[in-house]
């Protein structure tokens, strides 16, 4: 639930008259109902309407009294996202351009795998981290999303899947924005979708990725939640990483590894390192050796990502043969590594390509 204190703390949150009903955890809904003089068990009914029947309005909750429905409408909105554009890739990946209630736009991606359907969600409108290879950061940060707006992305995709009786089985928090810069709303989202009373998506089927906001890595390590954790690394040396990711000037590689060691001591969980390969920048065998030396001894996996084309950026994709050589060298040095399957690059839905492109074109 978004309180006045939360808004004061998070200056990039929207200032809507009513908050999204999807921003409430089940226990928060129970507590709110009791505070309003209502019966606690109504929370179960409300969540069934929201997450199982997936209604679009409070008026559709017909087993609630008219007075309770009015009370809910007076205090909350059922956040609905307007689908501006829906594009499907030749590999089955679907990208949604959603419009929020204040007119801003975000992108969300549905990826189909043999093991199920995965949704890549966005946590911010824009991004201020400034990675020099990424489209998401080109327009800067506009605002943070409420937890309910992140939940709504998953629900809207799930509604699209209902027609074919499919379900969202995995969530990756790797869309537009830096999740750890919207930490409280991200954690609220995680606890909501993981709850048995809502979408009931298992913690080990959810992955959150960060560019390396070190104070929040320590916070995340202290959370009692078994979410998968990934770190965008992209280089083992500060000089190269700072060129790719200016955030490294504030949180350098040495401090980042220390934070990851703390995370593993607290959680005993594996970390995934995301390593984008940029032609002539970080893709040589010497870079593989530097990476192996840096992370040796950590319980980790390296996800090698061929760079995706962004018109405003000058990076080029590493040759396929060099990608295989890089992977082979890591494995020779005892590092668990795989090459990420490319999905959605033909519709600008792949890693580093997400932004509100269509809406920007329309409003010029």
Swiss-Prot record:
- Report which reactions are catalysed by this protein: adenosine(2503) in 23S rRNA + 2 reduced [2Fe-2S]-[ferredoxin] + 2 S-adenosyl-L-methionine = 2-methyladenosine(2503) in 23S rRNA + 5'-deoxyadenosine + L-methionine + 2 oxidized [2Fe-2S]-[ferredoxin] + S-adenosyl-L-homocysteine; adenosine(37) in tRNA + 2 reduced [2Fe-2S]-[ferredoxin] + 2 S-adenosyl-L-methionine = 2-methyladenosine(37) in tRNA + 5'-deoxyadenosine + L-methionine + 2 oxidized [2Fe-2S]-[ferredoxin] + S-adenosyl-L-homocysteine
Enumerate the cofactors the protein uses. [4Fe-4S] cluster
Native species: Staphylococcus aureus (strain bovine RF122 / ET3-1)
- HAMAP family of this UniProt entry? RNA_methyltr_RlmN (MF_01849)
Q: Name one GO biological process term.
A: tRNA methylation
What compartments host this protein?
Cytoplasm
The UniProt annotation places S-adenosyl-L-methionine binding at: 177-178, 209, 232-234, 308
State the family named in the UniProt similarity comment for this chain: Belongs to the radical SAM superfamily. RlmN family.
Specify the enzyme's EC class, one word: transferase
- The entry's active site is 107 (proton acceptor), 351 (s-methylcysteine intermediate)
What protein name is recorded for this chain?
Answer: Probable dual-specificity RNA methyltransferase RlmN
**Cofactor note (record):** Binds 1 [4Fe-4S] cluster. The cluster is coordinated with 3 cysteines and an exchangeable S-adenosyl-L-methionine.
Keyword annotations for this protein, in alphabetical order, are: 4Fe-4S, Antibiotic resistance, Cytoplasm, Disulfide bond, Iron, Iron-sulfur, Metal-binding, Methyltransferase, rRNA processing, S-adenosyl-L-methionine, Transferase, tRNA processing
């Amino acid at each position: 639930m978004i309180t006045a204190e939360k808004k004061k703390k998070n200056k990039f949150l929207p200032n809507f008259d009513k908050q999204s009903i999807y921003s409430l955890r089940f226990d928060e809904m129970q507590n709110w109902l009791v505070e309003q003089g209502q019966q606690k068990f109504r929370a179960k009914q409300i969540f069934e309407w929201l997450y199982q029947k997936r209604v679009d309005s409070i008026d559709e909750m017909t087993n609630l009294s008219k007075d309770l429905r009015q009370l809910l409408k007076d205090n909350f909105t059922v956040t609905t996202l307007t689908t501006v554009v829906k594009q499907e890739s030749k590999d089955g990946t679907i990208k949604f351009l959603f419009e929020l209630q204040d007119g801003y736009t975000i992108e969300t991606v549905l990826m189909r795998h043999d093991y199920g359907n995965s949704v890549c969600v966005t946590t911010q409108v824009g991004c201020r981290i400034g990675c020099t290879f990424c489209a998401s950061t080109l327009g800067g940060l506009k605002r943070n999303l409420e937890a309910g707006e992140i939940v709504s992305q998953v629900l809207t995709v799930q509604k699209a899947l209902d027609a074919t009786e499919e379900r969202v089985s995995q969530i990756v928090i790797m869309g537009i924005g830096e999740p750890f810069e919207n930490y409280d709303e991200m954690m609220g989202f995680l606890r909501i979708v993981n709850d048995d009373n809502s979408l009931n998506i298992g913690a080990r089927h959810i992955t959150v990725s960060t560019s390396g906001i070190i104070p929040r890595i320590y916070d995340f390590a202290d959370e009692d939640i078994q979410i998968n954790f990934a770190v965008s690394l992209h280089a083992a040396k500060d000089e190269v990483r700072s060129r790719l990711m200016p955030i490294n000037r504030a949180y350098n590689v040495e401090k980042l590894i220390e934070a990851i060691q703390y995370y593993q001591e607290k959680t005993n969980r594996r970390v995934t390192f995301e390593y984008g390969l940029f032609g002539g920048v970080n893709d040589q065998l010497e870079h593989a050796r530097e990476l192996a030396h840096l992370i040796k001894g950590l319980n980790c996996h390296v996800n090698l990502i061929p760079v995706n084309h962004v018109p405003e950026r000058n990076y080029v994709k590493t040759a396929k043969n060099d990608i295989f050589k890089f992977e082979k060298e890591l494995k020779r040095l005892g590092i668990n590594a795989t090459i990420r399957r490319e999905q959605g690059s033909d519709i600008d839905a792949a890693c580093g390509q997400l932004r509100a492109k269509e809406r920007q074109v329309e409003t010029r």
